[in-house]
Amino acid sequence: MKLLFVTSTRLGDAIISTGILNQLIEDNPNLRITIACGPAAAPIFEKVPNLERVIVLDKMLFSLHWLRLWGLCIYSFWDLVIDLRNAPLTFLLFRKKRLGMGKSDKSRLFIENVSKVINLDQVASPKIWPGEVDLKLAEELIPSNVPVLAIGPTANWKAKTWRSEYFSELISRVTGSNGILENAHIAVFGRSDERPMALVLMEKIPDGRCIDLVGKISLLSVYTCLS
């Protein structure tokens, strides 16, 4: 069974969509999967079982990235096309069946609307597939003999960020004397281009307790470290 799975550009929305992808994999062990998504989300799909290809949809002028997707997929016959972006060009692919988001129910959570695409009665919980390298790296980076507090102090938009002094105060309360994670190490996560923002906070973390992972590991390794 050949599946084209068109999902989000945003990382968070793409992760939510992994729930129905996992359900399809469990229901169809012989599934052969092609995934189309934005560049930020692409790394989380690298180890999906039965993956044939990840098509990265870099945004182009006049929405030409959709035409590019059509050109890459038109020569295949798809047993199932799932399009969570509702791109009109996916209607023009050779396929047996196509499922899309349709009109979202504003009274429901996004994850509920995604689960309804394949007619699930319950919400499909997100699923990430890490590799052996990611699992091993997490064991090396995250100590098992002390508590660890994970902090993600950055964002892609400054208005979304919390001030570094607030994070510093939170760390002091949580890991200080009588805190719920007393003397914990602090693992700091973020993208490489967000490093200057993260450094402001990391400089305030006591020596020997900061685990600096900002821009140093892949998304799948971030997942295994947090697990």
Language-model regions, residue ranges each:
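Catalytic machinery of carbohydrate-active enzymes
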Residues: 1-227
